[in-house]
Curated annotation (Swiss-Prot):
Cofactor needs: Mg(2+)
InterPro entries: Thg1_C_dom (IPR025845), tRNAHis_GuaTrfase_cat (IPR024956), tRNAHis_GuaTrfase_Thg1 (IPR007537), tRNAHis_GuaTrfase_Thg1_sf (IPR038469)
List of residues binding GTP: D29, G30, K31, K32, F33, H34, S76, D77
Gene name in the database record: THG1
Binding note for cofactor: Binds 2 magnesium ions per subunit.
Source organism: Kluyveromyces lactis (strain ATCC 8585 / CBS 2359 / DSM 70799 / NBRC 1267 / NRRL Y-1140 / WM37) (Yeast)
Name of the molecule in the record: tRNA(His) guanylyltransferase
Family, as annotated: Belongs to the tRNA(His) guanylyltransferase family.
Residues the entry annotates as binding Mg(2+) 2: D29, D77
GO biological process: tRNA modification; tRNA processing
Amino acid sequence: MAKSRFEYVRQFEVHDALLPDTYIVVRVDGKKFHEFSKYYNFAKPNDERALKLMNAAAKNVFMQYKQEMICAYGESDEYSFILKRDTKLFNRRRDKISTLFVSLFTANYVSLWNLFFPDVVLHHKHLPYFDSRCVCYPNLTVVKDYLSWRFVDTHINNLYNTVFWYLIIKCGLTPQESEQKLCGTLSSDKQEILFSECGINYNNEPEMYKKGSLVNSKGEIVHIDVVKQIDEIFNGF
């Protein structure tokens, strides 16, 4: 940068470095995706195209910085990227890492859109956008619990949404009636309602819907029980 009398303004910049010797998780999350998915008429309760687009965008981000990564996990409109404890990426600057991941993810989402929605044109007034945050976790136990939390959240949300929407689509309930029917129900109750009233066995739903998507250390997209295979996922890290 050229020297000038105005250069003093750089003194006001803050370079917030993330804590050293900690695992960094960057979570990218869709903003106003309820409106976005409604405008583009995403299928309910799950849109396979949309989920595969998220996976493709996440994999490209992962592969771009594979040497810094352990894995990435996504469901719905969010993705978590778990960086190695000793990463020196951008000198661990919070703003650099956060903005890089969210901009790279968004760019890939938009550029890959036509591969998954070939007959749907993105409208300039209805573009996808995401936010991101960086969180430091002190040890592997906490990181494993973080990933397990996201996995369990996926199961809870997907089971509810699956039953909620099929009661509307297949049984003709209104959204209010469906919500009321599910109020106070346990997981087993929801599965029974889905089977007895909608004729759908939740166990036969696609693994991607039930378990989310993991980009493993090899860059492969898999749909596994994260809680049961948590030690295997982090083996060597």
